């Protein structure tokens, strides 16, 4: 979950997610990117669930998933339908867990934090492919620009903000973020 409490800090002082920038709950990759490890506790080729829902062994999946994908995945494994009129934000991870590419799986991610008394800043992040856009709701109080753009392929540590260098990409990401909101 991206770090526990720092040993000398208060209850909301989380440890480092180094080498990524940010910490738990922040707008940066260190606040949201977490490795997910999945395996059957005891691989058994005869087990009916494992036959129907195999998990690739010793594989690394590069397509992203979110915690919202776990509920639909568990429903699928258990062969249970979601309750009627219950909106699902996530998607079944079956193909990804098999080590396959899922062309239908979303390649974007939205994290929306425009509220909360515990926050020092309010933001929305939108990630699509290698690009990530951050919107700050109160830039005048935090001293940061309203928009920040990062190319995570070239700069996974979010050290170089590139919105001025890529104004067209910034504009297109803003429109995509608005559509998701």
Where are these regions (language model features)?
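Short glycine- and hydrophobic/aromatic-rich loop-to-beta-strand nucleating segment
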Residues: 36-38
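Short, intrinsically disordered, charge-balanced linker/junction segments flanking boundaries
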Residues: 171-181
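C-terminal cap/loop subdomain of S1 sulfatases and analogous C-terminal strand-loop tails that border
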Residues: 6-29, 46-48, 53-59, 63, ...
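Active-site-proximal N-terminal segment of extracellular/periplasmic enzymes that hydrolyze or transfer
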Residues: 160-168
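Intrinsically disordered, low-complexity polar regions and short flexible loop motifs
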Residues: 155
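Active-site metal-binding loops of divalent metal-dependent hydrolases
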Residues: 2-3
